[in-house]
């Protein structure tokens, strides 16, 4: 029994040693997942569930630290009883990743986002947001904070994007994007 236990520990240790990449290496990680998005100060609104998909590049600086940047299509906004505010962006996360345990990283960074779609949907009919509501800012800035776990090159990533800038170009409208994002990706060594 002791030999079996020792063999299992050795096997797990050898698998775990591949969970983090070598210093100086680059990886590409295509990923797909979902957003649970809302707008701060949007009274009586609910979260909009949407797609998050794209890719990130990562450079392993030291055994414990890496930097990453990427581009993700991100469906954001919020929902009301009979309407949906659709604010879709191309997010460009720039992150510092600290590996606190084998395969487990804590992330913090800055994320500019570029608006690619803004619509209101009311009772199934879709309207141009710029004509129907307040003008949306073309560029949004947020602070992503998150964690990820990598096993056999599969990466489960959860992060919260704190909106820093207002989503709309209006003195009366002070809403900011607030997005919880969870994705599953796969890292390829480059």
Kindly give the residue locations of the regions a language model identified.
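Short glycine/proline- and aromatic-enriched beta-strand/turn motifs that initiate or cap beta-hairpins
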Residues: 20-60, 162-163
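Glycine- and aromatic-enriched membrane insertion/assembly motifs of diderm outer-membrane
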Residues: 27, 45-84, 88-90
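Predominantly the C-terminal beta-signal and adjacent terminal strand-loop region
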Residues: 70, 76-90, 131-190
């Amino acid at each position: 029994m002791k030999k079996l236990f020792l063999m299992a520990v050795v096997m797990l240790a050898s698998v775990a040693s591949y969970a983090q990449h070598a210093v100086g290496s680059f990886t590409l990680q295509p990923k797909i997942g979902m957003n649970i998005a809302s707008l701060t100060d949007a009274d009586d609104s609910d979260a909009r569930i949407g797609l998050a998909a794209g890719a990130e590049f990562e450079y392993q600086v030291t055994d414990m630290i890496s930097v990453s940047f990427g581009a993700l299509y991100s469906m954001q906004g919020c929902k009301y009883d009979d309407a949906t505010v659709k604010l879709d962006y191309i997010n460009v996360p720039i992150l510092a990743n600290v590996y606190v345990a084998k395969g487990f990283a804590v992330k913090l960074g800055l994320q500019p986002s570029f608006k690619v779609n803004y619509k209101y949907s009311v009772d199934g009919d879709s309207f141009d947001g710029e004509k129907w509501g307040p003008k949306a800012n073309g560029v949004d800035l947020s602070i992503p904070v998150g964690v990820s776990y990598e096993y056999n090159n599969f990466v489960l990533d959860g992060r919260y994007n704190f909106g820093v800038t207002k989503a709309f170009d209006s003195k009366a409208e002070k809403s900011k994007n607030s997005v919880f994002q969870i994705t599953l990706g796969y890292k390829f060594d480059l």
